[in-house]
Amino acid sequence: MKLHELKPAQGSTKAPKRLGRGIGSGTGKTSGKGHKGQKARAGGGVRPGFEGGQQPLSRRMPKRGFTNIFKKEYVVLNVRDLEERFENGAVVGYESLFEVGLIKTIKDGVKILGTGELTKALTVQVDKVSQTAAEKIVAAGGKVEVE
């Protein structure tokens, strides 16, 4: 078998609908567009959400809420992630988290949460640590340094 001999599996493809090829084809003359009108013209049709002049649903609904421009967005990691990627006695900071592939970019900081178990003594230097995560890190013999 050669590359030019490859064909799709039998029945997996469908022939395209050929429009405007005579009345006998079933899709000749008006090509499935009916007679005249906006939708029969080239580039015809209405934009999404247009309801014929009636006030659209998107404008009938009230506005709600706002975007807090001071909101901080943290990269969230769990204790189990640290267990998997770090050796005993390691220092966990931005650079080391980046090196082991746990973070790609730092948004407003890093927060450690307490899901999973930790058996290694790690020194954790991040922006935020949950109470359960801090307890697990200290119980394993590590230190928490919140920056």
Curated annotation (Swiss-Prot):
Part of the 50S ribosomal subunit. HAMAP family: Ribosomal_uL15. The keyword Ribonucleoprotein applies. InterPro entries: Ribosomal_uL15, Ribosomal_uL15/eL18, Ribosomal_uL15/eL18_sf, Ribosomal_uL15_bac-type, Ribosomal_uL15_CS. Keywords: Ribonucleoprotein, Ribosomal protein, RNA-binding, rRNA-binding. GO terms for molecular function: rRNA binding; structural constituent of ribosome. One of its GO terms (cellular component) is cytosolic large ribosomal subunit. Transmembrane segments: none annotated. PANTHER family: 50S RIBOSOMAL PROTEIN L15 (PTHR12934), LARGE RIBOSOMAL SUBUNIT PROTEIN UL15M (PTHR12934:SF11). The gene is rplO. Pfam families: Ribosomal_L27A (PF00828). This is Large ribosomal subunit protein uL15. Residues 1-62 are annotated as: Disordered. SUPFAM superfamilies: Ribosomal proteins L15p and L18e.
